């Protein structure tokens, strides 16, 4: 889940604008796509708002879009045209940092890895399973068939929650 230099630069530029809208910045994706890039910003309710069962609204997304557009116009960090999307992370939320997974212990996550883990027939680069353990260096996932994978955090390319209706 190492962020690219461009994503880190964009995050540093837009974080204050997002905070000014009274929401938390969950993560940033930047996808250069030839003539038109995509900048996707995920916002989350502040912890105190989540405690009061408040969610991100369309009005929050519109406010962040307005604020961030102004900041990006001034700093101009993206060459060429781009599309700006602002939304909540949703039910199948992507994780951008290990600490974001803490609240989802015991839930099912999907991981795309840089290097395959396991051995023999259980060797894989994609792992889906219950998040059993997380520390500052690795996490442990148990798959539906009972296989346990201990995965170094720096081996994770992408991670997201798998929504399951309880």
From Swiss-Prot:
Its main location: cytoplasm. Keywords: Cytoplasm, Ribosome biogenesis. It is found in: Cytoplasm. It comes from the Bacteria. Transmembrane segments: none annotated. Pfam families: DUF150_C, RimP_N. One of its GO terms (biological process) is ribosomal small subunit assembly. One of its GO terms (cellular component) is cytosol. Required for maturation of 30S ribosomal subunits. Belongs to the RimP family. This is Ribosome maturation factor RimP. It comes from Psychrobacter sp. (strain PRwf-1). The lineage of its organism: Bacteria, Pseudomonadati, Pseudomonadota, Gammaproteobacteria, Moraxellales. The gene is rimP.
């Amino acid at each position: 889940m190492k962020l690219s230099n461009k994503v880190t630069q964009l995050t540093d530029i837009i974080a204050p604008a997002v905070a000014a809208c009274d929401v938390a910045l969950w993560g940033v994706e930047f996808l250069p796509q030839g003539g038109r890039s995509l900048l996707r910003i995920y916002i989350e309710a502040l912890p105190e708002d989540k405690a009061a069962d408040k969610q991100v609204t369309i009005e929050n997304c519109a406010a962040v879009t307005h604020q961030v557009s102004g900041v990006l116009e001034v700093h101009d960090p993206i060459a060429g045209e781009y599309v700006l999307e602002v939304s909540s992370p949703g039910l199948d939320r992507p994780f951008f940092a290990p600490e974001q997974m803490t609240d989802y212990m015991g839930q099912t996550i999907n991981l795309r890895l840089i290097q395959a883990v396991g051995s023999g027939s259980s060797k894989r680069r994609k792992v889906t399973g219950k998040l059993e353990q997380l520390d500052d260096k690795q996490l442990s996932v148990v798959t539906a068939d009972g296989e346990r994978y201990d995965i170094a955090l720096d081996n994770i390319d992408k991670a997201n929650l798998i929504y399951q209706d309880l």
